[in-house]
Structures are given as C-alpha cells and as structure tokens.
C-alpha cells in the first residue's frame, strides 16, 4: 500500500562487529523520547590503519571523488569512483574504473563499470544476500543491479535518460509518482528475507523526496515521505541515506534536519534520532552547519546492532550512536584535513565482519580503514 506524500510532510557502515572485541568503556545511556534506557555496554574505539589500502592502487590508478562504498560477505570492499579527476594528474597516473573492488588486505581485486551506463554522481551501493551489487547514481533516474564481478547487468529499474518529473527531464518538477522511476536517488538497501528494494529518492533540492519500495523484480509497491511537524514544514526533506536494520526498521538520513528518522517497513514513523554538533570556531560572519550531521550511516554487526555509525559532515567525524537510546556516545576521526585519520568531505561508510570501519571521502578522493584499537573481550 502507498502512503500519500502529504504537503505538510513535504516529502520524506562502521561498526562494532560480528563476534568482535572492543576496549571497554562503560556507560549508562540516557533516556530517549521513547523512554528506552540502554544497558551498560562497551563503546568501541578506533584508530586509523595508515598502511591501508596498498599502494600503488591498481596500475597507478587515480580516483576522483568517492561517492559511496559497500562490503560483501567476504569482506571485499566496493568503492564508487566518480572519476572527476584533476586532468593534469593524468600525466602521472591512469584513471581508475568507476567501481573498484579491494580485498581485506587493501589489494585491488578488479575495477569495472561503464561510466555512461552507470550514470552521473555515483552515490551509494549495497551488496545483497546473493552477493549482487546494487548501485545508485544520484544524477540519474535509475537503479542498477550487477553480478558481484560487475560483468553482467542483471536488472535496471527505471528508464535511462528519464526522470520522475513533470516533463521527464531533470529540469521538471518532482512527481513522487507511484511508479519505478526516480529523480536524483540517493541510497538503496534490499530486504534479505523478502527481496523488497528500498530506495531513498531525492538527494538534492529539486528532486523527489520519498522512500520508495519495490518488489524483487523492480515493480513499485509503496512509498512514504520524511516526517514533518507543522513547525518543520519549511525544512527541505532530503533523504540522503537509507539502511535496513535486523529488527524490521528503516533508518533514513534526514540531512537538512540533522537527524535520522526511523520507520517501520510499511512507512509508519517510529522516532527521530538527533545528531547534534557544536562548531569549534565561532560561526559569526561565515557559513556554518550547512553540510549536515547525518549524511551516511551503518550498523554495528553484532546481532542486536547496538551501534549506529554516522558520518557527520559538520564536525567532520564519525559519531557512534547508541541505537536504542539515540545518545551520541563518542566520535572518531581527527576533523578536516588530508593526513591519516582526518577527513575531507566524508561521504560513505561501511564495516567488515571483524569490526573494521571504512570511510570514503568525496573531496579527499580516498578511502580509509579504522581498526578496533587495543581490543579486549566483549561480553
């Protein structure tokens, strides 16, 4: 069934680890709006691995901005390369493919992808339960599913060159229509049990502003908007990320509102998780807080998915959030910059099966690995 996109609503990875161990810092989480109190639990701590990935990257490859990333069951990392390289740099390097696959040690396995077929502004990817790689290019109106090695396009949802707009072009008005065509899609996830496909559709103003759900063949099923109160109706709804939790919930980055919104799988609103920040330098006379605190997210891989790992572009760090209470417990990263452990416009995040966190940077044009620091047994 479809929930109407009401005008008032105006629409609308990382991780702990699977059987991993963490240094222990006990905490008692605060009570959220839903009066849930988190149990005392160890908070993971991370340190950058300066020797990952291995260099040279491929055959002296150079990347453009990295739009997103995802990880498969072998802990192979797939990185989305936008290929917007500095042209003079090509005198000393070769352009990398749009999709780069790395093994856990940081070696390049392969590069693949046709830039024209994939589309503009590669934004997010997801590896499903059958190891297929789903790719979202935000500048298009389509979603694509590839074999794990990228050799076969298994499914395309939406028509290339068309947008879900009033005139079918990128200049038209967004329609948020009941069909499987998109307008500036941002993120994708696939329900491992049902095969249903969840798409955050509308990563920039002027595009759609909805969560769309499709069946495993790509047929439209339902949609809903980001939640807005009457007082929030002027906050532009930009669903910038989307991930499905093990307990049947949908987590969406409500970028302009600096929070994560949680829904059930039919679109019923559950709660907000605010992601705050305080500028370290006075915002007087300069832009401040414009990038957003909730840009990308991933869950810890323990069965309860105790933590959320949230890319915060305002503080330029990764926030570790207690998923039950919504409390920001700690953060890692050394703020803006290009030294190891710093970030330049981080845009994608993922976690492997042993708890290593990977962060892809758009302006930094690199991916960094953060490993669990000085682990101790986790009860």
What do these predicted regions represent?
Residues 19-379:
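Eukaryotic scaffold repeat domains enriched in small/polar residues
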């Amino acid at each position: 069934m479809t929930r109407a996109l009401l005008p008032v609503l105006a629409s609308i990875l990382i991780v702990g680890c699977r059987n991993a161990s963490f240094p222990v810092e006990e905490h008692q989480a605060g009570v959220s709006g839903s009066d849930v109190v988190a149990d005392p639990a160890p908070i993971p701590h991370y340190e950058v691995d300066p020797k990952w990935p291995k260099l040279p990257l491929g055959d002296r490859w150079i990347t453009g901005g990295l739009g997103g990333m995802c990880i498969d069951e072998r802990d192979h990392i797939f990185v989305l390369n936008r290929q917007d390289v500095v042209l003079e740099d090509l005198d000393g390097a070769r352009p990398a493919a749009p999709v780069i696959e790395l093994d856990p040690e940081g070696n390049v396995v392969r590069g693949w992808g046709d830039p024209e077929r994939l589309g503009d502004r590669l934004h997010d990817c997801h590896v499903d339960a059958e190891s297929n790689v789903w790719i979202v290019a935000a500048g298009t109106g389509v979603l694509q599913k590839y074999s794990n090695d990228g050799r076969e396009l298994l499914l395309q949802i939406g028509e290339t060159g068309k947008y879900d707009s009033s005139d079918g072009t990128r200049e038209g008005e967004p329609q948020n229509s009941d069909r499987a065509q998109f307008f500036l899609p941002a993120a994708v996830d696939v329900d491992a049990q049902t095969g249903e496909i969840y798409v955050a559709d509308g990563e920039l103003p002027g595009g759609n502003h909805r969560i769309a759900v499709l069946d495993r063949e790509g047929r439209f099923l339902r949609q809903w908007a980001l939640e807005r109160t009457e007082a929030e109706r002027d906050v532009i709804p930009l669903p910038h990320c989307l991930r499905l939790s093990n307990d049947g919930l949908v987590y969406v980055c409500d970028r302009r509102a600096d929070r994560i919104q949680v829904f059930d799988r039919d679109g019923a609103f559950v709660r907000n998780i605010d992601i705050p920040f305080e500028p370290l330098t006075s915002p007087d006379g300069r832009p401040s807080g414009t990038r957003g605190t909730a840009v990308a997210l991933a869950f810890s891989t323990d069965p309860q998915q105790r933590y959320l790992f949230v890319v915060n572009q305002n503080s330029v760090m990764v926030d570790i959030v207690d998923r039950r209470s919504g409390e920001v417990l700690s953060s890692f990263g050394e703020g803006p910059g290009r030294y190891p452990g710093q970030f330049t416009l981080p845009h994608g995040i993922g976690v492997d099966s042993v708890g290593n966190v990977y962060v892809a940077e758009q302006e930094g044009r690199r991916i960094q690995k953060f490993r669990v620091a000085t682990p101790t047994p986790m009860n």
